[in-house]
């Protein structure tokens, strides 16, 4: 859910190292939200509990502030530990806005937080809108990256990427697909792979627009198509040579390994998608 407070005010920096004195700026986004006169800034550490119920934790620090000449409010505070902190702006005893900032330990403090979706369908499988429209809707709602991962199909992710290839926006559209192969009920997401795993075998479900390598890969480079019989032969060979626990379906297990191996070879990330069931009832036993 998008914070409506951020349509009227911006606060920055939003992420910074913990246990260090940090200056934070609050900027009104328009004349309707302008600061006038004197305010109180209340800072509370989220993990320390309600200040009224746990007063011994001293989880309420207050600052009296007035806007600078540019209309922004600035104050300096030491944010303890790795956690979220509430920043409340109070005027005449009433809260004007509550904003959040985040203090982090060194391992995360130098990184950027990004918002994205690793698995999304379009009308090319069981979604409702075209890939380009789905991508636009995600960007409109503040997402930084998106992988379109339609059932059996890799080319819809390329369709979205090509739709915006000449648009100068900081938006990372990633290749992807939802892989489900014959003899295996387990669906696996191929996130960011350079080529399609589904399209390693023939089938109308992913070749309805053609079977060229430009539709099966991001750079025109991918393995040749093999027959279903060859796929099963390779999976059965894996099943004989893997250390598969008793009670586990050997072909299913080996097929998953085969899929993950290809995703890794394609420099992608393999993600188990709903590994135990779908369609409102359980289909796959626990591995």
Task: Identify the meaning behind each predicted range.
Residues 2-69, 75-183:
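An N-terminally biased module of ancient metal coordination in phosphate/nucleic-acid-related enzymes
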Residues 107-273, 277-284:
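A metal-dependent hydrolase metal-coordination microenvironment
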């Amino acid at each position: 859910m998008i914070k409506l407070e951020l349509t009227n005010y911006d606060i920055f920096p939003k992420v910074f190292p913990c246990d260090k004195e940090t200056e934070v700026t609050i900027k009104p986004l328009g004349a309707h939200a302008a600061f006038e006169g004197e305010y109180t800034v209340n800072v509370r550490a989220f993990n320390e509990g309600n200040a009224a119920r746990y007063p011994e934790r001293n989880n309420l620090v207050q600052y009296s502030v007035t806007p600078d000449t540019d209309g922004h409010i600035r104050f300096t505070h030491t944010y303890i530990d790795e956690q979220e902190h509430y920043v409340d702006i109070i005027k005449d005893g009433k809260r004007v806005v509550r904003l959040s900032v985040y203090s982090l330990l060194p391992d995360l403090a130098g990184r950027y937080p990004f918002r994205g979706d690793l698995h999304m369908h379009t009308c090319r499988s069981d979604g409702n809108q075209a890939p380009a429209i789905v991508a636009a809707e995600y960007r409109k709602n503040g997402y930084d990256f998106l992988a379109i991962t339609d059932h059996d199909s890799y080319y819809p992710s390329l369709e979205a990427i090509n739709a915006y290839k000449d648009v100068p926006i900081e938006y990372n559209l990633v290749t992807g697909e939802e892989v489900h192969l014959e003899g295996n009920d387990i669906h696996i997401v191929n996130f960011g792979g350079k080529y399609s795993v589904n399209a390693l075998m023939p089938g109308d479900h992913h070749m309805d627009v053609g079977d060229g390598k430009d539709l099966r890969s991001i750079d025109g480079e991918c393995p040749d198509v093999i027959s279903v019989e060859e796929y099963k032969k390779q999976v059965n060979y894996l099943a004989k040579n893997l250390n598969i626990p008793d009670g586990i379906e050997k072909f299913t297990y080996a097929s998953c390994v085969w899929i993950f191996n290809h995703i890794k070879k394609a420099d992608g990330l393999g993600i188990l998608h709903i590994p135990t069931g779908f369609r409102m009832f359980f289909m796959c036993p626990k591995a």
